[in-house]
Amino acid sequence: EGLRQLLPSGIELVSGPGCPVCVTDQTYMDKALAYAEREDTIIATFGDMLKVPGSYSSLSEAQAKGAYIHVIYTPLEVIELSKKYPEKKIVFLAIGFETTIAVICATVKAVHDAGLKNVFFLVSHKLVPPALRALLDRQEGHIDGFILPGHVSVIIGEEPYGFLSKEYGVPSCIAGFDGLEILSAIANILEQ
């Protein structure tokens, strides 16, 4: 709320699809729940996935009913789980945007290099540029500009966003999450 008070009237900030958990669909969650319901399976996931709803339940509800859901803080923890429970299938819920793809790939390689046969990955990575295109194609409301995520942009660069101005005539600016960076990005967008 603090930044909004600093902005002149006529400028409205709208949060976009920045959280992979928030844009994880029910189909993916239903697949995860189907695995969670198996007695021979341990679901390894980040804690924020526990309350994401599927069409009929959530991981936290499945856990309350006896499913083994293990909250991890880094994907590499699946290796420890695999060794601790060799008789179980470890299914890691691999979600995220461009920023998490590298660490997931490193985990896949580490699992392969360790010869572990009981680790599986249920993957649902999202890409920011197609999400932005989908927002513009839907035209739900009017979008005058995009503040682009700095952490994703460090990985993909600025070129994948070129379509915003070329195809849609929508200005954009890459920024971090700090208040001053966001204000600078807004000023940059207004000048374009």
Each PLM stretch: what is its role?
Residues 1-87, 101, 111-114, 122, ...:
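Metallocofactor- and cofactor-centric catalytic cores in central/energy metabolism, strongly enriched
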Residues 28-30, 83-90, 134-139, 161-163, ...:
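Short, surface-exposed amphipathic charged segments that create phosphate/polyanion-binding patches used
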Residues 32-41, 89-95, 138-151, 166-168, ...:
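A polyampholytic, Gly/Pro-enriched intrinsically disordered region
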